[in-house]
Amino acid sequence: MTRMAWLGAILLTGHALPAAAQYASGPTFTVEASSDERRRGLSWSDGDPVVRATASVPVADGLSLDGAATSLWGSPRHGGADAVVDLGANYAKQLGGFRLTGEGRYHLFPGASHQGYGEVGAIAGFAIGPASIDLAARYAPRQSAIGGDNLYLSAGGAFAIPGTPLTLSSHVGRSSGDVRDPLVARRLRPGGGYWDYGVAIDWYRGRWSAGVRYADTDIDAPDSLHAGATLVSRVGFSF
């Protein structure tokens, strides 16, 4: 799919729906600083600190549009991009203790040419008291910017410690896919298919949040540059 086709699909999801916004709460905005931009175990910022701004706007019952902009400082992984802009739509449905979510997202890379790509996803979550479990599948169809297609399957859990502002979480994920251009496919899967995993502790107090996360992959050298074990710290403010 072309970049315009992806953007059109995402925007059409929420077209003509703002009038129904009374079914949802208001928009939320967050600014955050982080010691690294790690996604699926890979550093998108070449191991450098980043700043990020995110926004989520509800447009109907269960439906929201969201966007995020993150500094990348000339990321080698993404063709020297100065930033990544993530644009998406999410639809969530609560069924008893289960929460089902469908999403579509496009990643733009200002400062780099022919790097943008889109993906769709589905998440099934279940909550029991302060604990929750999520199973997710996200798929990027074949696109020249990623040298083929990409499938990411993951499982995660979180536990809000009663009586404290702390939440513990962990996840494991698997990246795989068809390769049409091996050199380009290394962008999202250096060395081929791989596992990533991590654990985190986050603190929430009012509009403030902070956290520390351990991230790692099973990618072997020499493909493991900025894909190995690391600690990532962050602090954020929402309004």
Feature map (PLM): residue ranges:
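Hydrophobic, lipid-facing positions within transmembrane beta-strands of outer-membrane proteins
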Residues: P27, P49-A55, V85-L87, L100, ...
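Outer-membrane beta-barrel translocator domains and adjoining extracellular loop/strand segments
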Residues: R39-D46, P76-D82, S113-G118, A145-N150, ...
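Short glycine/proline- and aromatic-enriched beta-strand/turn motifs that initiate or cap beta-hairpins
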Residues: A21-W73
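Outer-membrane beta-barrel "beta-signal"
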Residues: W203-G206, L225-F239
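Residue-level signature of outer-membrane beta-barrel architecture
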Residues: S35, V57-V59, Y91-K93, Y106, ...
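Transmembrane beta-barrel strands of outer-membrane/channel proteins
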Residues: F29-S35, G67-S71, G102-Y106, A124, ...
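Detector for outer-membrane/organellar transmembrane beta-barrel domains
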Residues: Y117-R186
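Repeated loop/turn-to-beta-strand initiation elements of outer-membrane beta-barrel proteins
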Residues: P27-F29, D61-G67, G96-G102, G129-L135, ...
